[in-house]
A protein has these predicted regions:
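Non-catalytic helical/linker scaffolds that mediate oligomerization, partner binding
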Residues: 1-472
Length: 472
């Protein structure tokens, strides 16, 4: 069983007949809906198709809504894109106009107030660079550095600039309510800078009936990196969003920051996603570069919970092949990792709570007895996530009666989510979970399984029980 989870971004490429279904068959665990692009109508069609296929395959494919966030983007171009030459003049304007070879609309109205002659402005994840020459109230005149192509809605970055805008825009609020109404499982919060950004989203979710939705904080700028410990504590998981991070910060810092952030989130027992340009060449080519293969493998060696495909599946020529390639790459390093050695080298927390202590003991018991699987029966998913935190070698069956938790566990490293029927007796629930494990093919008669849960059942945060069973 593959332990690292795969997130696929939906878009025009997966809208084609049969493509999303093939991605699911190939190993997709989570569907990402990028609300920086596409209308609610377009996203609704994707969600409806996803939910139809989820029901058909009875698979817990989670839905992740990625917000636009407090970012700056270009508007539309007359022909969808323009080609620019080194040294030519180009203007960014705050009046909403169709772009051409001389100008483009920029969504941040206050940008002229925040830049000055000599300021570097980067676009499209740093592929396009311009230098500011002159500024007035509504227009920034620039000179283009290097031949380049600009397309609709590409991101705009000014390294080191603090955006003087509220964290949650009206668009983000509208998108999040759309997600609540469509029962998404995760919100990926773009450009998180401080703990307050997470608190604002959580309060908004609470006010609008979205309490069960988990928040993944995207770390994309220096402020987010500087506040990483608090952001990890406040959120349910972290996305290492390397595209904007590599523009906002020196690119040579990105690998170091990636390892640091993955390590911190891993230690906190939360989910961590490594994202952006993982198989970027497969946008146009059927095979990845060797450097991309090494990049994906190194993220897995670092301990990432999930690896994400962005443009590769949303708009690339080879979306299905990209998923299949991710699966093959993930399987190889996983097969070579000594998880038991890592577990004992890692040790345990000095002051664990009851759940952490029981989960650590569960993993120790599984290693000592060479168990075939760990069965974590959980109300909120926390028990399964705590087991996942210790990266056990054997599969983790995350059993829950909640459909949302069932789907959310699809992002947890090493966890195979199983949906359980409601039971009033704890031992009947354990037997039911083991039977489901047999149906999944991860358990068979004669296997040894270690079960952990909480008594009384059905109450979140009460993990206090460990049981070893011989599967009949």
């Amino acid at each position: 069983m593959r332990k690292t989870k795969i997130i696929c971004t939906l878009g025009p490429a997966t809208d084609r007949d049969g493509i999303l279904e093939q991605c699911i068959e190939s190993g997709m665990n989570v569907a990402r809906l990028n609300f920086s692009h596409g209308s609610h109508e377009e996203q609704q069609k994707r969600i409806d198709k996803l939910y139809e296929l989820r029901k058909k395959y009875q698979k817990p494919i989670a839905a992740l809504l990625d917000t636009k966030g407090p970012e700056i983007r270009l508007g539309d171009f007359n022909d969808g894109k323009v080609n620019l030459k080194q040294g030519q003049k180009f203007s960014l304007v705050t009046n909403e106009v169709l772009g051409d070879e001389t100008k483009a609309y920029v969504t941040y109205k206050q940008l002229p107030e925040d830049v000055e002659p000599g300021t570097r402005i980067l676009m499209d994840d740093g592929l396009v660079e311009m230098i500011v020459e002159a500024v007035d109230e509504t227009q920034i005149d620039c000179v283009v550095v290097g031949d380049c192509e600009l397309k609709n809605h590409k991101g705009v970055n000014v390294p080191g600039l603090h955006l003087n805008m509220p964290y949650m825009s009206e668009k983000d609020k509208s998108d999040i309510i759309f997600g609540i109404n469509n029962h998404v499982d995760f919100i990926a919060a773009s450009f998180v800078r401080t703990v307050k950004d997470i608190e604002d989203i959580r309060a908004f979710l609470h006010e609008n009936g979205g309490d069960g939705i988990h928040i993944i904080a995207k770390i994309e700028n220096r402020e987010g990196v500087e506040n990483i410990d608090g952001i990890i504590a406040a959120s349910d998981g972290i996305m290492v969003a390397r595209g904007d991070m590599g523009v906002e910060l020196p690119e040579e810092e990105v690998p170091i920051l990636q390892k640091m952030i993955i390590g911190k989130v891993y230690e906190a027992g939360k989910q961590v996603i490594t994202a952006t340009q993982m198989l970027d060449s497969m946008m146009k080519n059927p095979r990845p570069t060797r450097a991309e293969v090494a990049d994906v493998a190194n993220a897995i060696y670092d301990g990432t919970s999930a690896i994400m495909l962005s443009g590769e599946t949303a708009a690339g020529k080879y979306p299905v092949e990209s998923v299949q390639t991710m699966v093959r790459i993930a399987n190889r390093p996983e097969a070579g990792i000594d998880y038991e050695k890592r577990f004992y080298h890692r040790g345990r927390h000095e002051k664990p709570d009851v759940t952490e202590a029981v989960c650590h003991a569960t993993c120790t018991t599984a290693y000592d007895l060479n168990a075939s699987a760990i069965v974590a029966v959980t109300k909120s998913g926390r028990t399964a996530r705590m087991i996942s935190r210790y990266r056990p070698a054997c599969p983790v069956l995350g059993g829950t009666t909640s459909k949302r938790v069932w789907r959310q566990m699809a992002m947890s490293w090493g966890v195979c989510p199983i949906l359980l029927d409601e039971k009033t007796d704890v031992f009947a629930l354990f037997d039911h979970a083991v039977d489901k494990g047999k149906c999944s093919g991860l358990l068979k008669s004669g296997d040894l399984a270690v079960i952990t849960s909480g008594v009384p059942i059905g109450i979140s945060g009460t993990t206090n029980m460990l049981k070893v069973v011989n599967v009949e």
